[in-house]
Amino acid sequence: MTPTTLPTSQRAVQQDGNGKLHVANNAAIPSLLPGHVLVKTYAVALNPSDYKIQKNFPIPGAYVGIDFSGTVVQVANDVDSINPGTEVFGAAFTFSSAHRLANGAFAEYVRVRADLLFRIPSEQQCQNDGDLTLFKAATLGTAMSTCLLSLWSPDALGLVGKPEEPVLSEKPIPVLVYGGSTSVGTIAIQLLKLSGYDPIATCSPRSFDLVRSRGASNVFDYSSADVALKIKTHTGGRLKYALDCISDVASVATCYAAIQRPGGRYVSLEYIPDELLAQRRAVRPNFVLSAELYGEEIVLGEEAYDRPANREKHQLAVQNVGMLQRLIDSGGLKTHPTEEIEGGLEGVVKGLVALAGGGHPRKLVAVV
């Protein structure tokens, strides 16, 4: 097969008329759009949003999946930044209804924006014995996208320090990562540390070593009755920023109680009801949907999730892709621990059921 020759159909995970997931053997291959490339998928990684979106916003025929790695096979005429044959990874956001009916990562082929793709480093580029494989790279798309918006978007935490321009201080500013052992949490901790901040985190005691290995200066048991007080004591009452990777009633309460008296900023990765966010007027909350960095309208049919097109967030992402790519090339980011799912796309369907049941600290990855 040449880079421009494709089969007439593909295998892909889709929803049936009842909203159930199945592997379709004759699914359409997404057409190439301006500014996009088509990738032959090698591996995919599972996220909670993969099963939540198909459960809460079912569409018969919808494709599923966000995180992927693979090889570029087709490039739109207006794209000159990448060539067929390049090994890449990223996030194929399918939150809008029209996009969900045409494209998803849990398939043999996936369509993605060229300006938001990351490249697998070559052996010549790798430093510090970097060994980012296609398998490991599949875990990074959503985590990196979410961290990009959560940490640096002006309406989120709005931090000024970045890995290439860290904040220099004898006493680094603390930032709480609630759920530090999640796939987003472990990446956020590393980016915060590299940006000159003092990342602290909550998680289960069984994950303390993992979270510390990623750069957290202190870790707290999320289930402790006085966890907020412990965080407040540790930070000397000067915690201004909290990234909540769990985003439930308990996590909101802990983050809000730990944030300093003058207030601060709180970012959730799930919708939080207004009555919970109104606990403290001095805290500025924001619900981050990483799909916003595509710069396109998000239409799911529910006000809490629907978003207008936001070119500023797309530009923020594009401006920072190079920085993150250089970090990847230098081996400066450790991927989340993985667990391989056997069975290809059929294994993905089973894996989503298992993920919904909880108890999976490792990132579930399948080779397509």
From Swiss-Prot:
UniProt entry keywords in alphabetical sequence: NADP, Nucleotide-binding, Oxidoreductase
Keyword set includes Secreted: no
Subunit structure of this chain's protein: Monomer.
Family statement drawn from the similarity comment of this UniProt entry: Belongs to the zinc-containing alcohol dehydrogenase family.
SMART domains referenced in this protein's UniProt entry, alphabetically: PKS_ER
Example of a GO MF term: oxidoreductase activity, acting on NAD(P)H
UniProt binding sites for NADP(+): S49, D50, Y51, K52, S204, P205, R206, S207, Y222, L269, E270, H360, P361
Positions with a binding annotation for substrate: F135, K136, A137, A138, T139, L140, G141, T142, S290, A291, E292, L293, Y294
Gene that this polypeptide is encoded by: TwmE
Pathway in which the depicted protein is active: Secondary metabolite biosynthesis
Protein name: Trans-enoyl reductase TwmE
SUPFAM superfamilies: GroES-like (SSF50129), NAD(P)-binding Rossmann-fold domains (SSF51735)
Described function: Trans-enoyl reductase; part of the gene cluster that mediates the biosynthesis of wortmanamides A and B, reduced long-chain polyketides amidated with a specific omega-amino acid, 5-aminopentanoic acid (5PA). The PKS modules of TwmB are involved in the synthesis of the polyketide backbone, whereas the non-canonical C domain of TwmB is a bonafide condensation domain that specifically selects 5PA and catalyzes amidation to release polyketide chain.
Disulfide-bond pairs as recorded: none
Top enzyme category: oxidoreductase
EC number(s) stated in the UniProt entry for this protein: 1.-.-.-
Pfam families: ADH_N (PF08240), ADH_zinc_N (PF00107)
